[in-house]
Regions:
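Conserved catalytic alpha/beta core of Sir2/sirtuin-type deacylases, generalized to analogous enzyme cores
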Residues: 1-185
Length: 185
């Protein structure tokens, strides 16, 4: 789940992954507050299962046989303590907010403060109630507080806006994958 603040000059430093980033590993313990890019190891894992990557697109094996395991040698371990690595996702108290996360949080807060009197859309895609205080409730509060704010929620089975902001909201009870982009492998 992402909070994304877009402007015309989009770039990666304008994205704040407040709930984490599937593209990063962290120590599962965690023994330290650092994350690691996992793109190369994930590609190796995917290829080891028989998939192919052509023109940046993931393709099923030609024979249709997908291996459901990866070689032991591809399992990542923490370079400091040796424990298994895990995805950098906010699921419990082990979530690592590294330096990059804190820098992104500051950029996000600055963006909100600089634009709160302008037209702003809070777009919520597939956010549930696992940790509503991180994305959902702040979006509702800012929509209610900021005069020109608008809230858009796309979430199958959980598309909802409180009464206080319903006139400034659009809620769509649809699956994000089918509504926003084409389905992938």
């Amino acid at each position: 789940m992402w909070i994304i603040a877009f402007r015309r000059q989009d770039s990666l430093n304008r994205i704040f992954y407040t709930q984490g980033d599937y593209g990063l590993f962290q120590c599962s313990e965690p023994c330290h507050k650092e994350t690691y890019d996992n793109e190369e190891i994930i590609k190796k894992m995917v290829l080891s299962q028989g998939f192919q990557i052509k023109d940046g697109e993931l393709q099923k094996p030609e024979d249709g046989e997908i291996k459901l395991t990866v070689p032991f040698s591809l399992i990542p371990y923490c370079p400091r303590c040796g424990k298994p690595m895990s995805m950098n996702l906010r699921s419990d108290q082990t979530f690592v907010e590294d330096e990059g996360w804190h820098q992104a949080a500051e950029r996000y807060e600055k963006f909100i403060q600089e634009h709160k009197k302008q037209k702003i859309v809070f777009l919520e895609l597939g956010v549930g109630y696992n940790t509503p205080g991180i994305i959902k409730y702040p979006f509702w509060q800012m929509t209610n507080t900021f005069q020109h704010a608008f809230y858009v929620c796309l979430n199958q089975g959980e598309a909802y806006a409180p009464e206080e902001i319903r006139k400034k909201s659009v809620c769509m009870n649809e699956e994000v994958r089918k509504s926003v982009g084409r389905e992938r492998v």
